[in-house]
From Swiss-Prot:
GO terms for biological process: seed development. This is a seed storage protein. This is 12S seed storage globulin 2. It comes from Avena sativa (Oat). Residues 1-24 form the signal peptide.
């Protein structure tokens, strides 16, 4: 009997280890912070002279604008990144599409909904409903005459959200607010997930675009009408329509009557309810259906799965539990999420694979910095990633130095501008009088920096005699060099401020330097 069970035990142990290894690879656990899943930049890249970038050109759609940065520039190609900025007008729908490279999206302003469609995951939003323009069905009428729809999870997005976009995953976005959604997209085209050429490619499921020299169409337009209709089980007339041959609206279209899909909303009693599809209408009407931060079942890190009229008798497998229920977005702007905070200098918030596990799928991370008037950031270098810095608000003096001690960038970075900071290059940033806010996209899910000054810095870690002999200074001067910043780290208070200078402090934040708790 034992002889019979032993081979079976070995077999199941092997299967468990195989599946566990596959999941670890899927979520990036096989990489340490010192490793990278990237292919590396172009050989011969020197980054001798950096520059601030603004969008090179715009492409207009029916309900929005797409701004493209110059991905052919050597700095973009050497860093292996591609950047675009989208403006989606109210009632604008970004049509379903996917990309050949993983990326991160930061919502600069606006609010709306987005959906990410993962293959093999269940459609957890399901509802049978009756068309709005028909009377109630008579009692006993067949339920099969009711319309039925089901789709995967829909995410509410707002200003300050970071959305993770894995390569090859279909996504869409709808603006249900009364102000445009402005979003910046950063793609890591050198990631191993991209096995095409190292440039960002959009694959449209609907609509068309004008990015290339020739008019780009959606993926269905390349198939013959007959084969397409047979494969999808539709008429040839419908097949011609989904090819969008004569559709001039672009990839952002206007939905005049509001978009209809199943979404959670909050009743006055508190629990999440779900009804037939309801069109997204005005902001006042929407606020009675769904209010951010008031739903106990629709918050960051949780998944909302409900299927009216159906019970799940099968158990979820590991893929569904760990992959399909991942949170697609996290808000990086909330002061309560700050990792470090100095009431006289500013705050810094990090998103990495530890507090945002979905970043393991895109192998990227993000850092948002809010510097107050004349505050300065500790000089540092990125240990394991390139950095794409996008100025959100205000201005900052930025200086970057290469391995030869040469200044490769020394200028004021302004709102809307972008700067690529290469790995290991040393950077120093100081806010102007109005302060500054920026976000940095890193090409590693657990990006690390080495600070030069402050409590956790390299200088603090070196012996006094090493500093004194290295710089030919006295021991007292070396001691001052180590400790002049006291207990400060990351964001520093300006040392030589004018009398009466304004003290910036966010409402609800502490009055002393502290390490913010999650």
């Amino acid at each position: 009997m034992a002889t019979t069970r032993f081979p079976s035990l070995l077999f199941y142990s092997y299967i468990f280890l195989l599946c566990n290894g596959s999941m670890a690879q899927l979520f990036g656990q096989s990489f340490t912070p010192w490793q990278s899943s990237r292919q590396g930049g172009l050989r011969g890249c020197r980054f001798d002279r950096l520059q601030a970038f603004e969008p090179l050109r715009q492409v207009r759609s029916q309900a929005g604008i797409i701004e493209y940065f110059d991905e052919q520039n050597e700095q973009f190609r050497c860093a292996g990144v591609s950047v675009i900025r989208r403006v989606i007008e109210p009632q604008g729908l970004l049509l379903p599409q996917y990309h050949n490279a993983p990326g991160l999206v930061y919502i600069l302003q606006g609010r709306g909904f987005t959906g990410l469609t993962f293959p093999g995951c269940p459609a957890t939003f399901q509802q049978q409903f009756q068309p709005f323009d028909q009377a109630q069905f008579a009692e006993g009428q067949s339920q099969s005459q009711n319309l039925k729809d089901e789709h995967q999870r829909v995410h509410h997005i707002k200003q300050g959200d970071v959305v993770a976009l894995p390569a090859g995953i279909v996504h869409w976005c709808y603006n249900d607010g009364d102000a445009p959604i402005v979003a910046v997209y950063v793609f890591d085209v050198n990631n191993n997930a991209n096995q095409l050429e190292p440039r960002q490619k959009e694959f449209l499921l609907a609509g068309n675009n004008k990015r290339e020299q020739q008019f780009g169409q959606n993926i269905f337009s390349g198939f013959s009408v007959q084969l397409l209709s047979e494969a999808l089980g539709i008429s040839q007339q419908v097949a011609q329509k989904i090819q969008s041959q004569n559709d001039q609206r672009g990839e952002i279209i206007r939905v005049s009557q509001g978009l209809q899909f199943l979404k959670p909303f909050v009743s006055q009693q508190g629990p999440v309810e779900h009804q037939a599809y309801q069109p997204i209408q005005s902001q006042e009407e929407q606020s009675t259906q769904y209010q951010v931060g008031q739903s106990p079942q629709y918050q960051e890190g949780q998944s909302t799965q409900y299927q009216p009229g159906q019970s799940w008798d099968q158990s979820f497998n590991g893929l569904e539990e760990n992959f399909c229920s991942l949170e697609a977005r996290q808000n990086i702007e909330n002061p309560k999420r700050a990792d470090t905070y100095n009431p006289r200098a500013g705050r810094i918030t990090h998103l990495n694979s530890k507090n945002f596990p979905t970043l393991n799928l895109v192998q990227m991370s993000a850092t948002r910095v809010n510097l107050y008037q004349n505050a300065i950031l500790s000089p540092y270098w990125n240990i394991n990633a390139h950095s794409v810095m996008h100025m959100i608000q205000g201005r900052a003096r930025v200086q970057v130095v290469n391995n030869h001690g040469q200044t490769v960038f020394n200028d004021i970075l302004r709102r809307g501008q972008l700067l690529i900071i290469p790995q290991h290059y040393v950077v120093l940033k100081k806010a102007e009088r109005e302060g500054c806010q920026y976000i940095s996209f890193k090409t590693n899910p657990n990006s690390m920096v080495s600070q030069i000054a402050g409590k956790t810095s390299i200088l603090r870690a070196l012996p006094v005699d090493v500093l004194a002999n290295a710089y030919r200074i006295s021991r007292q001067e070396a001691q001052n060099l180590k400790n002049n910043r006291g207990e400060e780290f990351d964001a520093f208070t300006p040392k030589f401020t004018q009398t009466g200078s304004q003290s910036y402090q966010d409402e609800g934040e502490s009055s002393s330097t502290e390490k913010a708790s999650e």
